[in-house]
């Protein structure tokens, strides 16, 4: 592909430069192959301009970025006003195939579940479907584990192109605030956007909640085209801001939840009742009532399911078929997932690693703890330090027994992280070794108790210093149960 085809007029007026043949794209100099266009991006930790020489030595045919380097280069340099946006659009042109129907979901919590639920609904309706997000890529034909909620534009567009070649016609993906703020999602032809909720998160990246919300709103202001669907959970303080952004873009508004527009295009939750490890729901859509049994635990999973249903309906699926499909949903891995029991007490694993998510998980499980609700959790290092005491206070208020442990301490002192949590959680126990904490919590379970192990969910690593050690909450639970059975 020609340089001009990838960068447009930014490639300049020199016909020889514009006609340079590009065989690939790269943002990491270590991944450059001969013939690649290297994007020298500046970031929070380093400046890509430092690696231009290495990229050229590896065979880069041209370099694109912000202000040009002060020294002459042996290959063309293209100066870009917005290098990150240009990268995303170039990736979309280099990997041009996309499913006909694409839904993106943003919000603090629930993105993974909504993307998974939307994929499952479409699959139930006989569409070849996929989802991309925190747990990676999942489709009818492939599952690829990932570590980023929103991959970099090259990886994202490559994945989208590949699954389209596989025959995928419907895609649901997570739109993180980082991904939106850094233009990683631009160039994706989004049919509908969904919004779950907003609470404190990523305060190590966003200076305040207003900046965080504005990053989320890019989905509705810039990515979903006019006439596309905007599915918004209407039960939150910031919902009005999201609705306003959607209406300003002339999107088809669908509100869901207890304040959803059930008389119109939205979905109103009329009633919900616990039914074992499921919930009986009464819903209203376009004035018609529907009664379904949702096989999921927790009010927040109802919200997630309704956003997913809205995305499916908003992209053309039959409402009756969509609501019937809700009765077959399976929770995403590590999202309030029932993984075992001891002495009749259920054991759950949940990804909750922020204050609001921890509160919702504990509140969801309270009805299942006739005796005591137990939680094991920690907080990540090199991340928002302000949430640690908040999570400690929430655990102390919502649970009966609290064990504070480690959760990806990274470069920080694990004991200091635990101390910040414990300061707000009087009576909590400290067991730094996560496997030991899980073992102790399970060993102490009595009939009528319920245990949730929070923070990691689907993850299979414990980051200590600069090293990622293999660790899985699922495996730790299995090992603890096996040890007690032997």
Predicted regions and their residues:
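N-terminal leader/targeting and accessory segments in enzymes
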Residues: 1-93, 229, 237, 268-272, ...
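Non-catalytic positions within long, well-ordered alpha-helices that form the structural scaffold/packing
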Residues: 52-57, 164, 186, 366
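Acidic, Mg2+-coordinating active-site environments of NTP-dependent enzymes
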Residues: 3, 68-73, 166, 181, ...
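Residue-level signal for inorganic ion chemistry
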Residues: 6, 36, 55, 90, ...
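Active-site regions of enzymes building and remodeling cell-envelope glycoconjugates
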Residues: 73-81, 144-147, 250-253, 428
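Phosphate-binding loop of NTP-binding sites
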Residues: 86-234, 240-251, 369
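Receiver (REC) domain switch/active-site residues of two-component response regulators
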Residues: 61, 191, 400
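ATP-dependent carboxylate-amine ligase
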Residues: 1-15, 34-37, 43, 47-50, ...
């Amino acid at each position: 592909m020609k340089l001009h085809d990838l960068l447009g007029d930014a490639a300049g007026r020199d016909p020889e430069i514009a006609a340079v043949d590009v065989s690939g794209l790269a943002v990491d100099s270590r991944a450059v192959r001969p013939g690649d266009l290297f994007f020298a991006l500046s970031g929070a930790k380093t400046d890509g301009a430092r690696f231009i020489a290495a990229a050229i030595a590896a065979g880069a045919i041209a370099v694109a970025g912000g202000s040009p380097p002060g020294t002459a280069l042996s290959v063309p340099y293209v100066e870009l006003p917005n290098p990150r946006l240009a990268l995303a659009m170039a990736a979309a042109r280099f990997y041009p195939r996309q499913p006909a129907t694409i839904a993106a979901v943003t919000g603090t919590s629930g993105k993974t579940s909504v993307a998974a639920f939307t994929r499952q609904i479409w699959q139930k309706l006989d569409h070849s479907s996929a989802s991309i997000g925190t747990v990676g890529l999942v489709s009818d034909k492939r599952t690829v584990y990932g570590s980023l909620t929103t991959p970099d534009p090259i990886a994202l567009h490559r994945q989208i192109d590949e699954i389209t070649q596989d025959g995928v016609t419907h895609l649901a993906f997570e739109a993180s605030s980082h991904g939106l703020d850094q233009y990683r999602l631009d160039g994706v032809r989004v049919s509908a956007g969904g919004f779950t909720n907003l609470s404190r998160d990523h305060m190590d990246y966003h200076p305040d909640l207003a900046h965080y919300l504005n990053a989320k709103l890019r989905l509705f202001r810039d990515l979903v085209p006019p006439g596309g669907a905007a599915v918004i959970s209407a039960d939150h303080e910031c919902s009005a801001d999201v609705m306003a952004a959607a209406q300003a873009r002339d999107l088809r508004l669908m509100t869901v939840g207890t304040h959803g527009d059930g008389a119109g295009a939205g979905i109103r939750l009329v009633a919900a009742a616990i039914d074992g490890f499921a919930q009986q729901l009464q819903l209203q859509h376009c004035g018609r009532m529907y009664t379904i049994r949702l096989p999921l635990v927790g009010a927040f999973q109802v919200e997630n399911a309704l956003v997913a249903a809205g995305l499916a309906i908003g992209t053309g699926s039959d409402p009756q078929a969509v609501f019937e499909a809700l009765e077959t949903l399976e929770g995403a891995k590590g999202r309030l997932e029932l993984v075992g029991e001891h002495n009749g007490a259920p054991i759950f694993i949940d990804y909750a690693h922020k204050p609001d998510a921890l509160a919702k998980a504990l509140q969801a499980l309270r009805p299942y703890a006739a005796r005591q609700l137990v939680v094991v959790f920690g907080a990540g290092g090199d991340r928002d330090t302000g949430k640690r005491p908040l999570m400690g206070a929430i655990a102390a208020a919502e649970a009966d027994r609290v064990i504070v442990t480690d959760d990806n301490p990274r470069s920080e002192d694990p004991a200091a992280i635990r101390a910040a949590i414990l300061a707000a959680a009087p009576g909590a126990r400290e067991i730094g070794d996560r496997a030991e904490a899980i073992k102790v919590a399970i060993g102490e379970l009595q009939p009528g108790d319920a245990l949730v192990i929070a923070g990691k969910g689907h993850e299979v690593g414990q980051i200590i210093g600069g090293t990622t050690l293999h660790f899985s909450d699922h495996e730790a639970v299995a090992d603890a149960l096996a040890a007690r059975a032997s």
